[in-house]
Amino acid sequence: MARTSESSPYVEFDRKQWRTLRKSTPLVLTEEELYGLRGLGEQIDLEEVAEVYLPLSRLIHLQVAARQRLFAATATFLGEKHPDQQVPFVIGVAGSVAVGKSTTARVLQALLARWEHHPRVDLVTTDGFLYPTAELNRRGIMHRKGFPESYDRRKLLRFVTEVKSGAEEVAAPVYSHISYDIIPGQYHLIRQPDILIIEGLNVLQTGPRLMVSDLFDFSIYVDARIEDIENWYIQRFLALRKTSFSDPDAHFHHYAGLSDRDATAAAQEIWHNINRPNLVENILPTRPRATLVLRKDANHSINRLRLRKL
């Protein structure tokens, strides 16, 4: 049985317990499709999709239906003309750099898009809402890129508000990991999705005023030991020398020719000066706000889950 307590707002599962909640949910992904969704260094396989993500997609499917009934009840109370109009269900996915939250978001998008009643599922990353490099330099916070203050939080909040309010088309800025900057004039157009997934480092943050996390209907925090995340970050950094960093136009092209030893030292410096402080100070404290925490072992596999029941 799942571990719970009458006085706790959470119920905890190991993977064996969680997988029983899949019920008859069919596996709709192929190995080839999963390969295209898997991030660099990720070890996710179809077994993990079946045992972790299918029960999760079933839970979200049930919550989408329940949330629509709640929205309809409020609309009826307000006397609106179309109380049954669908309101986009917004999911937040948070976690550290290199923890695998992007893979989680992509796999979830693929599974949810195949449910019968909500085929349109859009995914937007908060990278597009970083301030452009010129603005970060003007503010003197280029070294704080990825920290909460490096994002245009008002713009992100306005974007999600417009999507959830039913706007016919809303534009999300696009970020390039090659140029390490916002791409001028390029946008990801969101057109009235049934479900919108917002993935980013700091999406669960709160504040004295309305925050984007206040608009989430469901949220996921991808968790792991800090030491494991550091190791994954370093391994990913080493691998990027042969992929993204090898592009002559890449912002980090100067790392491409480093030896393993020098690249490891560079990655450790970035981790300890930027990514670890951001995780400890800003990201990790938001974990209790998540509806569901996915806990990874050192081999990247999800083996424990914590669901907020209240």
From Swiss-Prot:
The keyword Lipoprotein does not apply. Its main location: cytoplasm. It catalyses: (R)-pantothenate + ATP = (R)-4'-phosphopantothenate + ADP + H(+). GO terms for cellular component: cytoplasm. Coiled coil: none annotated. It is found in: Cytoplasm. It comes from the Bacteria. SUPFAM superfamilies: P-loop containing nucleoside triphosphate hydrolases. Its EC number is 2.7.1.33. InterPro entries: P-loop_NTPase, PanK, PRK/URK. It holds the Pfam family PRK. This is Pantothenate kinase. It comes from Rhodococcus jostii (strain RHA1). The lineage of its organism: Bacteria, Bacillati, Actinomycetota, Actinomycetes, Mycobacteriales. The gene is coaA.
